[in-house]
Amino acid sequence: MGKYIFKRVLMLIPVIIGVSFLIFVLLDLAPGNVLDMIAGDYTPEQLAELEHELGYDRSVFYRYAMYMWDLLHGDLGTSYIYKAPVWDLYIQRLPSTLKLAGASVLVSILLSIPLGITAATKHGSLTDNVSMVAALLGLSMPNFWLGLMLIIIFSQGLGWFPSSGDKDGILSLILPAITVGTGLMATLTRTTRSSMLDVIRSDYLRTARSKGVPEKTVVKKHALKNALIPIITVIGTQMGRTLGGSVVTENVFSWPGVGRLTIEAVKQRDTTTVTGCIIMSVIMISVVQLLVDLTYAFVDPRLRAQYASSGKKKKAAAAAKKAGEAEKGGV
């Protein structure tokens, strides 16, 4: 298990290099740079000095090498737009993104999994058909459109919730969480239903029913446990994306999270902030995916046994190799 985690961490290195280089190249191709945005705050001499310091008088490859060298030393750089270290900016915005991600995922799980189970156990019924139509609608609605509709109806129309910011506590969180959670809820409902149907129709559950095991026990104790892996995969994927920053939703609701910080930095050609935010988002997504993979082993005993047998086989092969080398040396 330890070797598996180590390999996954190593796999993150080329991903970070590739993503950061792509960001540098794309922003370099765009007209203007961060110096154009801050020119009014400096004299021409200071701007020339700053241009040399930031490497804008050299190639994008040189600037990228400078950035990666600083990154290796744990420095995400300094934003000349916000006049603060990128790490501080990221940490300042992260709690808002965590609140939004946690609320949307939690509500989605609490609603969609029971709905998916009900749809599967009542396959072909009115409940099943209505839930699938609702899930299809949830998948079809773009986040920006849904967010705007919620603002028009519940904020501007009824005045129940604030339309922007996070100053009103949980009231400010409700509309953004619904916007982010709707797509996840739809996906999770369909996944739960599909996975449960596959398990419910399996032979071993038919055997359990034939032995007189109550249907509730069959569903809760046997079917749900064996249907969890696809469900966990969807939850982990969506959680990772949300932690990376719900860019569209955060901008629609002026939510002060990582996604909005990234968009603001893009508009102002703040390459350092954009790169730092995206690198941290990639790390967050990768960590969540790693946790999902490790969760599989706890949910499914077969995978746990596979990890154990894989480790034993490698140890046995290494021991056999050493024994062979010792035998050759003795000869």
Q: Model segments located where?
A:
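Alpha-helical transmembrane segments of integral membrane proteins
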Residues: 2-3, 92-127, 167-319, 324-325, ...
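Cytoplasmic-entry segments and transmembrane alpha-helices of multi-pass inner-membrane transporters
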Residues: 2-11, 111-150
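Hydrophobic alpha-helical transmembrane segments of membrane transport/permease proteins
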Residues: 15-65, 158-175
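Transmembrane helix irregularities
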Residues: 30, 138-141, 243
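Membrane-topology segments of multi-pass transport proteins
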Residues: 35-81, 308-331
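Membrane-interfacial helix-loop-helix junctions in multi-pass membrane proteins
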Residues: 52-61, 76-86, 168, 180, ...
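An internal, D/E-rich "acidic patch" concept
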Residues: 57-113
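Membrane-water interface segments at transmembrane-helix boundaries in multipass membrane proteins
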Residues: 83, 132-194, 312
